[in-house]
Amino acid sequence: MFARAFPLLRPLIGVIDAEQAHDLSVRALEMLPLPACGPDDPRLAVEAFGLKFPNPVGMAAGFDKDARVPDAVLRLGFGFVEVGGVTRQPQPGNPRPRVFRLPQDEAVINRYGLNSSGMEAVRQRLAKRRRAGIVGINLGANKESVDRIGDYVALLRSLGPHAEFVTLNISSPNTPGLRDLQGRAFLEELLDRTLDARAKANLATRVLLKIAPDLDDLQLDDIVAVALRRPIDGMIVSNTTTARPESLKDKAQAKEAGGLSGRPIFRPSTVKLAKTWLRVEGRFPLIGVGGIASGADALAKIEAGANLVQLYTALIYQGPALLQEIKDTLEAAAPPEGLPAIVGRAARDWASSAC
């Protein structure tokens, strides 16, 4: 129903403010009585992080920031959903306007600044869930925090019991200084403190790390080396980029500050994914995100090293029908032994290609 209505609503969505359009989409999912999708083909099933996913396609963080509609998103047919980013204390984020469409590029620039209703509000919503389905939570530090690592620890303790996985988001370009946590010393302390908190709380929640696409090879080497020496469960590659490719057509909007997402970051994020996969060598799973706008894109991410994929920006332009197109493509491409058999088979080619 929601997918069928999108073509009718698309002209309206395209002319109103981008953030208002996003808010309307969330409200529609809150209000509409969506029927659950039918079961996925068994060939789409994936096991990762010790969890069984009905299909490998997830809704990326950024859509359901305050965990208002995780079950509605799952009913659309996603294999999992990641809510957030969530901060320890409520914060308004950056001043509006802070979201900008680049329709000629099928891209978006955002500088939300981790606007969040806060940890306690999200905890209360998730505690009321009764529906089965895999939900992850993207965790972020408050802009004015004096102990950002302490924020992640508190978020894990509070929200961990209500999620199958949490993501340590240290790669948002819109919180000043947050990407500094990708440096080796900060990252070691972050992982040590959060993983120690998980162990002491006896939580089964998986802990993932989300990195930026703008890392150079030496920075990536450091991050992977630190991660592999600790019981981290996986990585998400990658967040939005601060780069502005010369190929962008919406030149005026491209001048806006913030993180670029959508089709233009598909290649650089997939190259980064492949390079990460070659360094990790299968020791933990990877989620590939960035620029997926078709079934072929999702398949390419898997062949570059992703066990699971996520998308969001392309849905703004193509609507929820894109999800079924992606699943149909993956189902057709899956060998008899399933999608895990093709993970990483093109990683070396991607890693050696130019961004």
Q: Model-flagged regions — what are they?
A:
Residues 66-73, 153-154, 215-229, 278-282, ...:
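Catalytic cores of alpha/beta
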Residues 141-153, 180, 186, 209-229:
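Active-site glycine- and acidic-residue-rich loops that bind
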Residues 90-106, 244-258, 314-341:
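C-terminal helical cap(s) of enzyme catalytic domains, especially alpha/beta-barrels
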Residues 52-58, 131-139, 200-215, 277-288:
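Short beta-strand/loop segments at the ligand-binding rim of alpha/beta enzyme cores
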